[in-house]
UniProtKB/Swiss-Prot annotation:
Principal place of residence: secreted
Source organism per UniProt: Homarus americanus
Organismal lineage: Eukaryota, Metazoa, Ecdysozoa, Arthropoda, Crustacea
Subcellular location: Secreted
Cross-link (Isoglutamyl cysteine thioester (Cys-Gln)): 27-30
PROSITE patterns found in the cross-reference section: ALPHA_2_MACROGLOBULIN
Similarity comment text for this entry: Belongs to the protease inhibitor I39 (alpha-2-macroglobulin) family.
Protein name (database record): Alpha-2-macroglobulin homolog
GO MF: serine-type endopeptidase inhibitor activity
Superkingdom, taxonomy of origin: Eukaryota
Tissue: Hemolymph.
Function: Is able to inhibit all four classes of proteinases by a unique 'trapping' mechanism. This protein has a peptide stretch, called the 'bait region' which contains specific cleavage sites for different proteinases. When a proteinase cleaves the bait region, a conformational change is induced in the protein which traps the proteinase. The entrapped enzyme remains active against low molecular weight substrates (activity against high molecular weight substrates is greatly reduced).
Keyword rRNA processing: no
Cellular component GO terms, alphabetical: extracellular region
InterPro entries: MacrogloblnA2_CS
Amino acid sequence: SYIITTPRMWVAGSPAQVRTYVMPYGCGEQNMVNFAPN
């Protein structure tokens, strides 16, 4: 998959996954995702 930096595009893709890659600074959840197995 590819990373999108356009806010409106986040809705088009998977909100959960796209957000995690596009907004790593959004919340601590991003850190958890990196350590958690898919």
